[in-house]
UniProtKB/Swiss-Prot annotation:
Ligand binding (Mg(2+)): 773
Domain of life: Viruses
Entry function: Component of the DNA-dependent RNA polymerase that catalyzes the transcription of DNA into RNA using the four ribonucleoside triphosphates as substrates. Second largest component of RNA polymerase II which synthesizes mRNA precursors and many functional non-coding RNAs. Proposed to contribute to the polymerase catalytic activity and forms the polymerase active center together with the largest subunit.
Binding site for Zn(2+): 1092, 1095, 1105, 1108
Record protein name field: Probable DNA-directed RNA polymerase II subunit RPB2 homolog
Amino acid sequence: MNQLNQKTKLDKHLSSDNRAKIVADYFKTNGLVKHQIETFNHFISKGLKTIINNESSIKYQSHDNYSLKFTNIYVEYPSIIDDDRTIRDLYPQEARNKDLSYTGNVCVNVIEMVENKEGKPPQISEQYRVPIAKIPIMLGSDVCHLSKYTPLENEQINGHSQADQGGYFIINGKERVLISQVRKAYNKPVCFVKSTSQKEDVLICEMRSMCEETFHSTSVQVKMIKNKIMVSLKLKRKLIDIPVGIVFKCLGYNPDQMGSKFRSLFNLPPEYEKYIDAIKNDCLEEFAYGIAVSAADGDNSDSGGESGGEEEADQEEHIVKVFRNMSTSVDKDGGMAATGITIEDVQKSLDMDLFPHLGITSTRKQRVDLLAFMVKKYLLTLTRKIPVDNRDDYNHKRVETAGELYSFLFRLLYKKFQKTCITQIRNRKPDISNFLRTSGITTGILYSFSSGYWGVQRNTYIRTGVSQVVNPKVSLLANYSSLRRVVIPESKDGKEAKTSEIRQIHPSSSFLVCPVETPEGKGVGTVLNMAVFCQVTTGISTCEIMDQIDSFGVDLKCHCTIKDPNNCLLLLINGSPYGNGHANVIHRLNFLNDTNISIVVNRALGVIEIFSDAGRFIRPIFDLDKICNFEGEIVPSFKWFLDNQLIRYIDINEAAANSIAIELRDLSTNPNTRYNLMELDPCGMFGIVAGIIPFPDRTQSARNCFYSSMVKQAIGFVPCHNLKTETVSHTLNYPQKPLVTTSFAEYNQLNEYPNGINAIVAIACYTGYNQEDSIILNKSSIDRGLFGTITYNTFTAQEKKNGIIEERIEIPSNAIKIRDCNYGLVGPDGIVRLRQRVKKGDVLICKVTIKNKNQDEKLVDSSVIVQHGEEGYVDRIVDNVIDGCRIVKVVIGQMRTPEIGDKFCSGMAQKGTCGMIFPQEDMPFTASGMTPDIIINPNCIPSRMTINQIISTVMGKLYTVNPNPRFRNGNSFQENSNTILKELCHHLKLNGFDPSGSEVMYSGFTGERIQSTIFMGPTYYHRLKHMVKDKMHARSHGQVTTLHRQPNCGRSQGGGLRFGEMEKDCILVHGATQFLNERMFLNSDPFQIDVCKDCGMMSSTSKKCHHCGSINVKRCNIPYSCKNLLQELNGMGIKTKIDL
C-alpha cells in the first residue's frame, strides 16, 4: 500500500476524535501507577515464593539431624488484633489515624523433621498457617482490602478517594513510596571506551552476568592487551586476563583443529581473518606462556566442535598449566600469586564465573557461542563497523520498581533469617510458632521503609533515599509525580555524578522519560519522571520463553556456514544463546505476543535478540501496517485496539529498529520515509506534571522545568483531606478549574482537584511595588476569598508504658502544671474541646509522665502545648485505643489570607512574591469598571519568553464569552499551531474586545486615563506553600547558646536572623560603623576582659597581670566568641596579644 492510500485509511481510522477516545480509555484502564502495582503483585505472586522455595529448608547437623521446611507460601490481607484478642481486617484509613503500618502476614506451612542417627524412623510434624513475617502492603494491590471494592464503594465505605490510585505504603501512619531506581542492564554486552591511569583509552566489551535463580553475578570483559584479545576471568576471587583462544580451548573448542568451523563461530566477513588467526595462534605459541604443548595436549574435536579423543588427565593438566602460567605473568605486574590453582578452581571459574546467567545446566557450547558473540561485537566496534555503545543509552539500562526493590530487600533479610534460625536451633529446640513469629524480617523491612536505607546492615551496598514520604501533601498532582519518579543513583565512588553526560537528555529516552520534569541543582538529570504512557515490564523468565519456543516446534538447530553468514543468525534470549536460525525464523516467533517480550533482529551483529527481563521501559504505540490491513469496523477503545494487535507495546530495542511517526501529518510531510509505527499522542513525550502546561512548545525549556518544580508546591485540594491527619497540610478554600487546560489534565481528573484560581491579571508597571518579581494584589479580591487557604497542623499524644516510665493522658495536678500555660480549654478527659480558638500557650492534650525509679514516683507534666505560629481553631479530634493505650490527635486549622512576602506563580512559571496589597479603589480599572486581581511587571515577559502565558490569557478571555471547547484546548503540537493566535485574535474582535487582548484603563489614584493600553485577562495562578507566616521571625532579646553566648539560630528556638560576613561588608561600605557595632556586638555577645597593656595578654584579675606581673591592667570590650577563639589558640600553643 503506497503512502497516499495508507494516509487516507489512517485518517479515517485514526481521526483526532478516535485518538482522543483511545487515549482517554488508556488512562481509564491503566491509570498512572500501574507500573508500581503490577510489579508489587508480581512480587507477591511469584517473587516471594521463588525466594523462599529456592532455600525452603533449614538444616542443622547434630546428634539428631534437625530440619525445617517451608511450603505453601502466601500473603494474608492486612489485619489487626483488638484488645479482646479478636482478629479483624485493617483498612488504610484506620492505619493512618492510629499511626499503624498497613501490613500483612507472610504465612507458610512448616514441616519439622528430626532424623535419629540410631536408625529410628524420623519424627515429622507439620504446622499450618505459621506467620514468618509481616510485610507492608501496597494500596491498590491484589492483597489490599481496597481491591475488593469498586472505587465508588471505597470512597463511600472506606474513606478512600476515587482519584487516589494507590501505589504507596502506609508505615506508622505515614504514606511512603518506593522511588524507582535505574541500574545497568544485566546479561547484555556493552562496548565502551575506558580511560586508564596511563591516560590511554582502552576499548572494552563488558557483560554483567546475573543468574535469575541464584542472583549470583560477575563481570566478563573482552579487551585487547599487547595486540592480544583477552578475557577477564575471576579465579580465586581475583581477576586474571586470559587470551581468548586459551579460553576456547579450555572449553573444548580447539581453534587449530576445528578449522573453518571455528571461523563460523564468529560469523565475520573475510577481512577479519587476521583477528581469527591471532586467536588461533594464542594456543600455538607455547613459549609465550612457558609451557610445553605437545601433540598429546591438544584437543581433537568432532563435527559438532566438542572436545574428545584425548586422555582426560592430560587435558586437565594442560588447562591447569595454562592458568597457572597466566596467573604468574599477572603476578609479575602486581597481580595474584600462582600458587594453589587446581583443576577444580579452573572448572569453577569456567562454570560459575564465565556467564553464570546461563545456569549450571547449560552446555559449554552455549558459553562458547556467547563468548564468540562478545568477541565479534568487540572486533566490529574496534574496526568501527558499528559505533561504540553509549552507556547512558536507555537501551543499556533497567529500572527497579517497587516489586524488584522489595524482592531485593526480602531476599537479603530472608538469608539473614536463616542464619538466625540455625543459631537458635543450635542452642535449643525452639517452639516453632513463637520462634518464627519473632523473626527479624519484619523489623528489617520496617526499618528500611522508615529510614530509606535499602539493604541490610553490614552489607557491602546499601542504597539511600529509596523510601520517601509522599510529601508535600498539597495536591493530587504532587502525589502522582512522586509515584512516577525515577532516580539514577550515584555510583559508589561518586565519579559519575560529576560528569555532565549522565545528566543530559539522551535521544533513547524519548516518550519514556519526561524531558522537562527534573529538579534544579544537584538532582538535575538524575531525578527524573516517567512519561505519561511509559510502563515497566514485570519480566518473564528465560526458561519460560525457551519452553514456549520448544512447544511450538521452532527449529533453531541449523548450522552456520561461511558461504551464507548473513542469513544465519544467533538467537539470544535475555543474553542466553539458544541455537541458530535463518532470518525468516523471526516470523515463526510471532506467537511470543506478550507485553513483556520484545524481538529484534540486529543484522549488523548477526543476532536475533529476545528480551523478556524485568525493568525495561515500554510504551503503547499504533501499528500502522496492521491498521491499514485491518478490514472491518474500528472501535475507538484502547483495550479493543490492544486485543486486536492494532496497538502494541514496544521497548527501546524495538523503537530503535522501527521508523516511528510522531503524528499523522508526518506521513505527508516526509513521503520518502516509510513509517510502520506511530505514537498515541505527541504530548506523550511529557510526564504528568509537564503534561498540564498549556502550550509548552511556546516557551523556553527552562520555564517548563521551573513550573514542574513549582506546581508541586502549589496548594490545592487533596482528596478526602478531612479524613487525613498529616503533620502539616494545606487546602485551598476556593479552587477553580483552569479556563485553558490540556487533555491529560482532563483524562486523569486533575481538573476535578484543582490547585489554582483563574485570576484577572494585568501586565503593567504600577507604583513600582511590582518591580522585579513582585506582584500587586487586590485587597477586595482577597476579602472575597482570593487565594485563601487553611493550614492544618496535627498534634499527637500517645500513652506508653515502658519499664520504669509510664505516660498517661490525664489532667495533671496543680503542683506539676507548667507555668504560664492555659489549661482552661481542656475537658475532663484532658483533651481540648472541639471548635475552640487556641493560641500560644494553650494546652491541647494533657499528659503526665510517671517515672518509677528506686520505688520513688516522680510526676512530670508533658502536655502538648500550642507554640508560636500554630494558632488556630480545633478542627477535629481523633481518639483511638491501640493495645490498651490511647492515642489522641488534635488537628488545628489556621485560616491564612495572602500577605506581603507570600509566593505565587502562574501556570506558565511566572513566579513572584506579593510586594503590595492595594484596596480596590486604588487599583486601575477599565471603562466597564473591571479591576485586576493581580498586577505583574511587563519586564517578566521578554526575559523569560513565556509566550504561552500570553496565548493562554487571550484564549481564556475568549472562552469566558464564547465557551467553545476548542477555545480552552492548550495542548502542544496542535495541527493549527501556526494560525491559532491569529484565530484567537480574530474571535476576540468579533466579541467586542481589542484583538491584541489589551484594555484601556484608568488610574485608581487620580481617575485619569493611562496613556498606554494594558494587556489584561484571566490567567491561572497558584499560591505556593512558601508563606511569610511560616518563615518570618525576629527577636530583640532571648535565649543564647551556652558556648558562645550568641542568640540561638532558627525560628523554632526563638532565634534571630544571621548577620553574616556579606551583611557586614554592606554596612561597612556605607560607613555605618555605629550600627555595625550595635548589630555584631551590643545585640550579640558583649563581654569584658582584663588585658595587660604591657604584655598584651589576657589577665585573670584586674589588679595584676599573672603573666608579667604588671599592674597596668585595663578592662576592654570584646565579643565573647572572640574571647573563646583567643583561648582556643592559646590552648594549641599559639600566643595571642591584644594591643590597647
